[in-house]
């Protein structure tokens, strides 16, 4: 689920060339476009909790915020369905957005406390999309 070193180098540049954009669109399709838009709209947050120095990445999606463990996991439905169950993809656009944001240092840094982290995790770890609506 990680980007290749070549991809990381391309994304680390200040400006993407048209060739770079074409490459990523061909490889990742709409996911790249959505991920880049999320980054450009400043919807990626890096929380740093004190005193533990725990880092948590959040990507704001269309309907809620998603907890992202870089290169590993996302709490969104797409990750569960496309990556875990059907294995038709190796990442959702939230994971891609987090990697792009980190490489480009284009994210909001949020300082908070460990006490607040416990409360936030209750919301972030929600998987109520799995529940059947009554």
What do these predicted ranges mean?
Residues 1-134:
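Long, low-complexity, compositionally biased intrinsically disordered regions
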């Amino acid at each position: 689920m990680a980007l290749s070193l070549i991809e990381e180098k391309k994304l680390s540049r200040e400006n993407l060339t048209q060739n770079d954009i074409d490459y990523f669109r061909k490889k990742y399709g709409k996911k790249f476009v959505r991920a880049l838009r999320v980054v450009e709209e400043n919807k990626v947050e890096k929380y740093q909790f004190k005193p533990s120095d725990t880092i948590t990445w959040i990507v704001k999606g269309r309907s809620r915020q998603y907890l992202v463990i870089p290169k590993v996991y996302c709490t969104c439905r797409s990750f569960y369905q496309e990556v875990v169950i059907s294995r038709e993809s190796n990442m959702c656009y939230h994971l891609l957005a987090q990697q792009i944001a980190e490489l480009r240092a284009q994210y909001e840094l949020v300082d908070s406390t460990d006490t607040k982290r416990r409360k936030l995790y209750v919301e972030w770890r929600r998987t109520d999309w799995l529940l059947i609506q009554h």
